[in-house]
C-alpha cells in the first residue's frame, strides 16, 4: 500500500507558476481514438483560482506546461502547449475578499502545425519518415524566403530575435532528428500539389506509411514508423491498477470492413475481400487513400486493413487507472506519468465478460487532475490491429494441420 498525490504544477512564460490550492482542476487529452486514424492536437483545460484584485499575466499564445509528481521522486511533464482561450469568471466577490476563476485552454504542437503552409516547392519521392521530417522542418522553421523583403528589424518588437521570429520553435525542430523515425517503412510518391496545409499533408504521409505522428508530454512531435512498436517494453496492469467500475465494450457493425479498396500512385487501386465476413455481416466496403508509390505496398496495406477490420472488436474501449489509489505501485505510477502513444499494455485481470486477457497499445489518454487525485484513462487498440493475425473464420474449413502453410506455424501463431 502506497500513498500518492499528483500535486500538479502549471508554469507559464516568464516563470509564473501555480500549484497547491491555486489549482481547481486540470484535464488533458492527447492521442487518438482509433488505430486507423492519426492523432488530433492535444489540449488541456486548466482552472485556476486567484484573487480578483490581482489579474494574471497570461495571454493568448503564451507557452504553458503541466507537470505532476512521479510515483518515486521528482516530477514528469505531461503537457506542453500554448494558450488558445482565456475565460475569467467570479466565484465570489465582496468586502471580505474575492475569488476569480481563470479557465484556460491550451493546445499542443499539432494545433500550431494546422496553421502552417508547406509544399510550394513539392517533395521528391521518398519514404514516409523522411517525408514527415521534411514537412515538419519546413512548417516550423522560418527561412529568409518566408520574410517580407521590405521588413526591417526596427519594425519588430524590441525583444524579437531571429530565434523567436514568427514563433519559430527551434527546440522542436532540432529534436526531430531523434523523434522522427527516418527513413520509414513505405515509399511515397512525389508530391507536386502546391502549397497546402501542413497538418493535413503530414497526416496523409503518416497514414500512408502506417505510422503515427503524436505529441509527447514534453511538447515534442514524434513520428513512429510501422515497425517501431515492436521495440517498446510492455507494461503489465493488474486488478490492483484498473478501475473495474465503468469498463465497457461495444461490438459495432459500423466498424466492420470486409471489402477493402486502397488507392495509391496516380489513383490506381488494390482490393481485398473476406468472403466469410461478407456471409456473416453482409458486404461492408471501405476505402483508404494513400500516397504510396508501389503496388505491392498498396496490396499489403489492403490485406492488413481487411484482416484487422473484417470482424468485430470486443475489448474495453477505455481502461482507467486511478494513480492516487493505494493499490497502485510507484513503479506503475512512474510508467504511466510518462505514458506515450504505442506503449504496449498487457493485463490478465479483466472480468470474464471482457475475455479476461488483453494485449495491445495505448493510442490516446486523458488526464483528470486535482491536487490530490489523478485519474488516467487509456484508449487502447488490440495488438492485432497494428500487426494483424488470422481468426478462425478466415481459415477454410477444409484446412488440416498437415496441409497448413507454413508448416512451422504453431497454435499460438493463429
Positions of PLM-derived features:
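Acidic, small/polar-enriched beta strand-loop surface segments
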Residues: 1-19, 123-130, 200-359, 367-372, ...
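Generic structural motif
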Residues: 8-10, 23-28, 64-66, 174-184, ...
Amino acid at each position: 500500500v502506497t500513498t500518492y498525490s499528483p500535486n500538479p504544477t502549471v508554469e507559464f512564460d516568464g516563470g509564473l507558476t501555480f500549484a497547491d490550492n491555486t489549482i481547481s482542476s486540470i484535464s488533458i487529452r492527447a492521442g487518438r481514438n482509433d488505430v486507423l486514424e492519426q492523432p488530433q492536437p492535444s489540449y488541456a483545460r486548466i482552472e485556476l483560482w486567484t484573487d480578483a484584485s490581482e489579474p494574471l499575466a497570461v495571454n493568448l499564445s503564451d507557452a504553458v506546461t503541466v507537470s505532476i509528481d512521479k510515483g518515486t521522486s521528482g516530477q514528469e511533464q505531461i503537457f506542453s502547449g500554448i494558450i488558445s482561450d482565456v475565460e475569467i469568471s467570479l466565484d465570489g466577490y465582496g468586502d471580505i475578499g474575492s475569488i476569480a476563476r481563470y479557465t484556460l485552454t491550451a493546445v499542443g504542437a499539432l494545433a500550431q502545425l494546422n496553421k502552417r503552409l508547406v509544399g510550394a516547392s513539392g517533395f521528391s519521392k521518398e519514404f514516409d519518415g523522411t517525408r514527415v521530417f521534411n514537412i515538419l522542418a519546413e512548417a516550423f522553421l522560418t527561412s529568409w524566403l518566408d520574410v517580407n523583403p521590405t521588413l526591417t528589424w526596427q519594425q519588430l518588437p524590441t525583444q524579437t530575435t531571429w530565434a523567436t521570429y514568427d514563433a519559430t520553435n527551434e527546440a522542436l525542430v532540432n529534436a526531430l532528428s531523434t523523434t522522427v523515425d527516418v527513413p520509414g517503412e513505405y515509399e511515397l510518391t512525389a508530391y507536386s500539389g502546391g502549397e497546402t496545409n501542413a497538418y493535413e499533408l503530414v497526416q496523409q504521409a503518416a497514414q500512408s506509411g502506417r505510422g503515427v505522428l503524436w505529441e509527447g508530454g514534453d511538447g515534442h512531435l514524434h513520428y513512429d514508423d510501422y515497425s517501431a512498436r515492436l521495440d517498446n517494453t510492455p507494461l503489465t496492469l493488474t486488478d490492483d491498477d484498473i478501475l473495474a467500475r465503468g469498463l465497457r465494450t461495444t461490438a459495432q457493425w459500423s466498424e466492420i470492413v470486409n471489402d477493402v479498396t486502397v488507392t495509391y500512385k496516380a489513383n490506381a487501386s488494390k482490393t481485398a475481400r473476406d468472403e466469410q465476413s461478407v456471409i456473416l455481416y453482409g458486404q461492408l466496403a471501405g476505402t483508404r487513400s494513400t500516397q504510396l508509390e508501389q503496388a505491392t505496398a498498396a496490396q499489403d496495406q489492403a490485406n492488413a486493413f481487411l484482416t484487422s477490420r473484417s470482424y468485430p472488436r470486443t475489448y474495453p474501449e477505455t481502461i482507467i487507472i486511478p494513480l492516487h489509489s493505494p493499490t497502485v505501485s510507484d513503479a506503475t505510477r512512474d510508467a504511466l506519468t510518462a505514458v506515450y502513444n504505442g506503449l504496449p499494455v498487457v493485463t490478465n485481470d479483466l472480468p470474464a465478460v471482457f475475455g479476461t486477457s488483453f494485449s495491445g497499445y495505448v493510442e490516446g489518454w486523458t488526464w483528470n487532475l486535482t491536487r490530490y487525485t489523478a485519474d488516467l484513462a487509456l484508449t487502447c487498440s488490440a495488438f492485432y490491429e497494428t500487426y494483424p493475425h488470422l481468426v478462425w473464420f478466415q481459415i477454410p474449413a477444409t484446412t488440416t494441420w498437415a496441409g497448413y502453410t507454413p508448416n512451422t506455424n504453431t497454435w499460438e501463431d493463429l
